[in-house]
Structure formats: structure tokens, C-alpha cells
């Protein structure tokens, strides 16, 4: 342990002197994964600081512990320890009331066992504690699990560890293929009697002798290991006494359960309806990201802004945006997308099922699908990014294609019209001469040239640095998306070789024509083709009946509904002018209002064909989202609504229902409700006058009948 760590430990101890040691709930966070499953990214940055939906992984773990009442958290750092310490010092964890986060370092640690022996040597753990990986995301009720662990300890002091599991199917998206756990446990006490974590094995067996002690044993293959353990101090002592313990699951648990000398017991705690998952490889990184976007991790979701340094808001289709995001022209932001502040997306670009960080510049006609774009990335016009990770500071030049499953490291420069084949891994990192396996590690790097073909007068710093292709092949299933041959390997041993063509880490070639788009999802294709149909109809002045026939054909071909059609038609009608050479960008609000009135009136027979009572409220919200993404239309939201009402595309009932839904929102939705107040009041007064007129007519009829 370094001098600074000793000082931190001493200051930490003095600050907690007022509390009795048994009253302090402590946790040990493993800040190192001791593997290369995120290489080459983790050659430059620790896994715990990698962004997951634009928030460092470590923040999810610390937030979970703090919310669970943990008062003292020790983060044990090994690789890139200085980065973790610097991050904690500069974050809210440095002085958060009620929670003390202390960094400990072990520069010579090579395994989890070494780290736990380091914690033992520090003598900072006083009682039962939480042992957790620094890449865990959870919203579980930890206090309930702690109480069950304490109750078990009172009954039997030899019950030294409770392991947390989540019930899920064997094919669940957050279940890593390399963490294929089978446990055998006492049905009544949940004591674990046998543990098997061998993905290559086709069957699991148990000793018959165990049934003499445990008459009722159940086999559980429906559990995901959350890597959250509630431990007694004896666990650290056992690691200190056994230097051959390198891994908790493979060594410690196996030894405890099979030892004839030790009488220690391990138990399981199974979550019901709560969330916990570890981001242990690229596949689970993708899965947990989707779970966060779909709000399974609530309250740790983007729009809850739980780290107090973000400004996300949620709109329909699971789209999260921070403030000061610029969406230009007719760019399309599709489902399951997160966009950080100060990011700009150019006209004609399509972003779907992706996370984009802060301060990114996305050019025109860029296509990004299923990808993770971190902070300060530049992607120029006509580039295609397919299910890939682009790390901070990288530059992707125009017309380049990043194949599915690729990883682009920090500050990498991809030249114009370059194509990276699927599962390429590119890094600016160089092999470390201080590594123990220097010769082996050097073999993982191969220098490549990704600069522009005509690279005579470029001043970009990224271009002039040495770029390497990372050649270390990932373990089976450890890719952001499945390889084609993954399904083949489901039925064979995991140590057999995969597709030889992928071992090079991906080839690079020039791309002069990327018209064929290999990544466009059906929803995006439909939106684009309907938009093209409307634009062609405007320019060529086609009859509305012909346009309707074409859109109906697309509707059935892509299995879309009327609302999908309207949300694809309206943006084009509003953005495009009657002349193909002019747009709405330079007109005044009054001119824009007049243009909208004429355009909606002219196309109302077409719009009515796709409108239905069931979808009218949703259509209003879609128009609101469109105005959010296109600032110039915010001021004419009410005229758009008015024209759609006048032309029977939406009803007054739908407008009333929309207003009722957003009433009380003073920020985002409140702006639109305020804009429409006069129009809604007019509708209500007109409705009341109509009701009064109807009542008067009824009275006249009654009097006539009485006469």
C-alpha cells in the first residue's frame, strides 16, 4: 500500500471514530477485473471508468452501495489506479455526506485473491462487509439480504458468505456465456452444497453423500451470478492463509465446498423482481445498456440524473436527450437512443438504438445503429457505424464504414473512405515493455495505416501517431454482437477454434461507394422510403391517390400502422417547400405559419386516410417531439395543431386528452400547453356553445310535442 493510501486509511479511521465499528456498514469494491475482456480499451482506461449509457460504471456501483446505507467504501485499485483515484477525488464521491469512499492500491496485484489479501493486510474491515465488483449495476434491496445473512450467522457462525443471484432463464441477455453457473443448494436453507461454473461442460454432477446431510437438494440453472457477496471477515483471513486462492468463484468457493477440514458454509440469496447484473464482457455491456435505457434499473436511469451532473429528459420511444443537443435538418433519432449535451447531429443522419456521448459532432447523412459513441468523437459525412464502440476523441472521416462488432480505441483516426471489416479492434496504445508477458503481448499489436490516401497537408494530431490493430482474439461469445459462428459453437467445446477469417482482428480497405447500407433497420427504411415518396410527390406534383397507393404498399411491406405513416409524412411536409430548391430555414414565423396552413390543407385528404381516433393523441405527442428536435417549429406548434384540427386529421377530444396528460409539467411539455392555451380555450367555448344550442333545440322540440 502506498503512503497516500495509508494517509487515506488513517484519516478515514479518524473520521469514523464516533461510530462503533459494528455499526459501520462497509464495502469492498474491486476496481480491477484482472482480465482483458475489454481489450484494447482497458489498455488505456480501467473498466470501472468506462461509460455505460454515458455514466462511468463505477458510479452505478457506488450509487447502489450509498443508497443501500453503506457508510464506508474501500475501492481497491490495481491497473490504472491513478485514474480511479483522480476520478473519485474530482467527483461527488469525494465529500458526499454520510458516505466515505477510500481508494486503496495494490500495484503488484495480479488476481482477485491478491487484492483481497491486500485488503486483509490493511486491517480496515471490522465486521461483515459487502464484496462487489466495480462494474455491477443493481437496484436491489441490500438491507433485506444483509438481514438474512445476519440471521444465518446467528444460527451458525460458520456461514461466512451469502452470494446474491438473480433468477433468469439460461438464455437471458445479461447472462454471460462465460459465467454459466449451476448451483446445488439445500431447498430449505439455501445453503450451497455444490457449485459448477464450467461453460464447456454439458452436464453437472453431485456426490450422493451430500444427500445424507441435506435430504432435499435442488439444482438451479436459472440463476445469474450478480457478483455481490455478503462476507464475514473470515473470508479475508482464508484468502490470506491460502495464497493459491486466485479467484473467488473458481478457487475459494470450490475449496470451501470440497474441503474435508474446513466446516465453513456458503449460502445463496435469490432476487425476486429486483435488478442486478455485472458488466463482465462486451456482450453484457450491450445487454445492461439496453436494460438501463428500458428502465429496469430504476431509479438509476438517465432522466433521473442521479449523479447530479446531467440534464437528461425522456421522450417517447425511449429517447433520452440532454439539454443543448443540436439536431439539424431532417435527421432521424430512432428508438432506444441516448444523446449527451453539446452534441450536434447533421441533416439526413439516422441514429437508432445507440448511445452518443457529450461534445460529439455527427456530420450529414451518417448512419449509426446499435453503437456506443463516447465523448468528443467526430464522425464526418456519409459514414456508417454498425454495432461498434467508438472511444473518446476518435475521428471517423467521411464515407468510412465501421463494421459490426468493431472497437475503435481512444483518439484513433480513421481516414476518408476507409472500411473496417467486422470485429476489427483498433488502438493507439502501444505494448507495455514492463509487462511480465512482454513477448506475448507484443504479438497482439500490428501497426496499420488508417490515414487518408492523400495525406499531404493534414494537421490533425491523431493522424501522425502510431495506430495498431489489436490481434488478441476474444473468447467465444465475448463480442458486442454475436459472430456468425457463435451459434455453431453452442454445440461444441468452447476451446475449439472459431472462424479463421476473424483472427486478424479485421481487415482494412478503401471504401469508395457505400450506397449499400448493411445496417438500416426496417423502421428506418420505412421512414426514409415514405419521406422519399412524399418529396417526389411534391416535386412531380403527383396525384394524392398515387402517393397514397405507394405509401400503402410500404405500410404493408414493412408491417407499419397509420401512426407510423403520419409520423413519416408530416416532417417532410413541414420541412419541404413546394419548390425543391427552397426550405423553411430562412422564413419568418408568420411565413412559416402560412406555409404550414397551405401544405396541410393541400395534403389533408392523404393525412386523413392514415388517421384514426386511437392514435390521434400519440400523433400530437409525435408532433411535439418533432418540434423539440427542430427548434424553428416550436413557435408554430399551435398553428400545426390548429390546421390538423381544421382538416379533420385530429379531433378536439384528442387535443383535450393531450392537454390533460401534460398538465402540471412546467418545463418541457408546459411550454406547448401554454402556447396552445388560447386555442384550447376557444375549442372549449365552442363546445359549450354547441352544447347550449343542442339543449335549446331539445327544449324547443319538447315544447312542440307538448303543444
UniProtKB/Swiss-Prot annotation:
This is Translation initiation factor eIF2B subunit epsilon. Signal peptide: none annotated. GO terms for molecular function: guanyl-nucleotide exchange factor activity; transferase activity; translation initiation factor activity; translation initiation factor binding. One of its GO terms (cellular component) is eukaryotic translation initiation factor 2B complex. Residues 516-693 form the W2 domain. Pfam families: LbH_EIF2B (PF25084), NTP_transferase (PF00483), W2 (PF02020). Belongs to the eIF-2B gamma/epsilon subunits family. Component of the translation initiation factor 2B (eIF2B) complex which is a heterodecamer of two sets of five different subunits: alpha, beta, gamma, delta and epsilon. Subunits alpha, beta and delta comprise a regulatory subcomplex and subunits epsilon and gamma comprise a catalytic subcomplex. Within the complex, the hexameric regulatory complex resides at the center, with the two heterodimeric catalytic subcomplexes bound on opposite sides. It comes from the Eukaryota. Residues 489-526, 686-707 are annotated as: Disordered. PANTHER family: TRANSLATION INITIATION FACTOR EIF-2B SUBUNIT EPSILON (PTHR45887:SF1). Residues 688-707 have a biased composition (Acidic residues). Keywords: Cytoplasm, Transferase. It is found in: Cytoplasm, Cytosol. The gene is eif2b5. GO terms for biological process: cytoplasmic translational initiation. Acts as a component of the translation initiation factor 2B (eIF2B) complex, which catalyzes the exchange of GDP for GTP on eukaryotic initiation factor 2 (eIF2) gamma subunit. Its guanine nucleotide exchange factor activity is repressed when bound to eIF2 complex phosphorylated on the alpha subunit, thereby limiting the amount of methionyl-initiator methionine tRNA available to the ribosome and consequently global translation is repressed.
Amino acid at each position: 500500500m502506498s503512503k497516500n493510501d495509508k494517509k487515506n486509511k488513517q484519516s478515514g479511521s479518524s473520521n469514523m471514530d464516533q461510530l462503533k465499528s459494528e455499526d459501520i456498514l462497509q464495502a469492498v469494491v474491486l476496481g480491477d477485473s484482472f482480465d482483458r475482456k475489454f481489450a484494447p480499451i482497458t489498455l488505456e482506461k480501467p473498466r470501472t471508468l468506462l461509460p455505460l449509457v454515458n455514466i462511468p460504471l463505477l458510479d452505478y456501483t457506488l450509487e447502489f452501495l450509498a443508497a443501500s446505507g453503506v457508510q464506508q467504501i474501500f475501492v481497491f485499485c490495481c491497473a490504472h489506479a491513478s485514474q480511479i483515484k483522480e476520478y473519485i477525488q474530482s467527483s461527488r464521491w469525494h465529500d458526499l455526506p454520510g458516505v466515505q469512499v477510500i481508494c486503496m492500491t495494490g500495484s503488484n496485484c495480479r488476481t482477485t485473491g491478491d487484492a483481497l489479501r491486500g485488503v486483509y493486510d490493511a486491517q480496515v474491515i471490522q465486521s461483515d462487509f459487502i464484496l462487489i465488483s466495480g462494474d455491477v449495476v443493481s437496484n436491489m434491496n441490500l438491507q433485506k439480504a444483509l438481514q438474512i445473512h445476519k440471521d444465518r450467522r446467528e444460527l451458525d457462525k460458520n456461514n461466512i458468505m451469502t452470494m446474491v443471484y438473480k433468477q433468469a432463464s439460461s438464455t437471458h441477455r445479461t447472462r454471460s456465456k462465460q459465467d454459466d453457473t449451476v448451483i446445488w443448494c439445500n431447498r430449505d436453507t439455501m445453503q450451497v452444497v455444490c457449485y459448477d461454473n464450467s461453460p464447456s461442460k454439458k452436464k453437472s454432477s453431485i456426490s450422493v453423500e451430500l444427500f445424507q446431510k441435506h435430504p432435499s437438494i435442488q439444482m438451479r440453472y436459472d440463476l445469474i451470478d450478480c457478483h455481490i457477496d455478503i462476507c464475514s471477515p473470515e473470508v479475508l483471513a482464508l484468502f490470506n492463509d491460502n495464497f493459491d486462492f486466485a479467484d473467488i468463484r473458481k478457487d475459494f468457493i470450490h475449496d470451501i465446498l470440497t474441503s474435508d477440514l474446513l466446516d465453513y458454509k456458503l449460502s445463496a440469496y435469490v432476487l425476486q423482481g429486483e435488478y442486478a447484473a455485472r458488466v463482465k464482457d462486451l456482450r453484457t455491456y450491450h445487454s445492461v445498456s439496453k436494460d438501463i435505457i428500458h428502465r429496469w434499473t430504476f431509479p438509476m436511469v438517465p432522466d433521473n440524473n442521479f449523479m447530479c451532473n446531467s440534464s437528461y429528459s425522456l421522450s417517447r420511444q425511449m429517447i433520452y436527450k440532454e439539454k443543448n443537443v443540436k439536431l439539424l435538418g431532417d435527421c432521424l433519432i430512432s428508438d432506444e437512443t441516448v444523446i449527451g449535451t453539446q452534441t450536434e447531429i447533421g441533416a439526413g443522419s439516422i441514429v437508432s438504438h445507440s448511445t452518443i456521448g457529450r461534445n460529439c459532432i455527427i456530420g450529414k447523412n451518417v448512419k449509426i445503429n446499435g453503437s456506443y459513441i463516447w465523448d468528443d468523437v467526430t464522425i464526418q459525412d456519409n459514414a456508417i457505424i454498425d454495432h461498434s464502440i467508438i472511444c473518446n476523441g476518435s475521428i471517423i472521416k467521411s464515407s468510412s464504414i465501421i463494421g459490426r462488432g468493431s472497437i475503435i480505441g481512444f483518439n484513433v483516426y480513421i481516414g476518408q473512405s476507409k472500411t473496417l471489416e467486422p470485429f476489427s479492434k483498433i488502438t493507439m496504445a502501444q505494448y507495455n515493455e514492463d509487462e511480465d508477458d512482454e513477448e506475448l503481448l507484443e504479438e497482439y499489436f500490428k501497426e496499420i495505416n488508417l490515414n487518408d490516401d492523400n495525406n499531404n497537408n493534414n494537421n490533425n494530431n491523431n493522424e501522425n501517431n502510431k495506430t495498431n490493430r489489436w490481434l488478441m482474439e476474444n473468447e467465444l461469445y465475448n463480442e458486442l454482437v454475436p459472430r456468425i459462428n457463435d451459434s455453431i459453437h453452442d454445440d461444441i467445446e468452447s476451446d475449439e477454434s472459431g472462424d479463421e477469417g476473424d483472427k486478424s482482428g479485421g481487415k482494412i480497405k478503401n471504401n469508395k461507394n457505400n450506397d449499400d447500407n448493411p445496417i438500416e433497420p426496417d423502421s428506418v427504411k420505412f421512414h426514409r422510403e415514405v419521406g422519399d415518396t412524399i418529396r417526389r410527390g411534391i416535386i412531380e406534383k403527383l396525384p394524392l391517390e398515387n402517393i397514397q397507393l405507394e405509401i400503402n404498399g410500404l405500410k404493408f411491406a414493412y408491417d407499419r400502422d397509420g401512426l407510423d405513416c403520419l409520423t413519416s409524412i408530416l416532417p417532410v411536409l413541414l420541412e419541404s417547400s413546394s419548390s425543391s430548391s427552397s426550405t423553411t430555414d430562412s422564413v419568418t414565423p408568420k411565413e412559416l405559419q402560412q406555409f404550414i396552413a397551405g401544405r396541410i390543407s393541400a395534403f389533408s385528404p392523404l393525412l386523413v386516410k392514415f388517421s384514426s381516433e386511437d392514435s390521434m393523441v400519440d400523433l400530437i405527442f409525435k408532433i411535439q417531439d418533432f418540434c423539440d428536435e427542430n427548434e424553428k417549429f416550436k413557435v408554430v406548434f399551435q398553428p400545426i395543431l390548429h390546421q390538423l384540427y381544421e382538416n379533420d386529421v385530429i379531433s378536439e377530444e384528442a387535443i383535450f386528452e393531450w392537454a390533460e396528460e401534460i398538465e402540471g409539467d412546467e418545463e418541457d411539455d408546459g411550454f406547448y400547453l401554454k402556447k396552445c392555451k388560447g386555442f384550447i380555450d376557444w375549442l372549449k367555448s365552442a363546445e359549450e356553445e354547441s352544447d347550449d344550442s343542442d339543449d335549446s333545440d331539445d327544449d324547443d322540440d319538447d315544447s312542440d310535442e307538448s303543444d
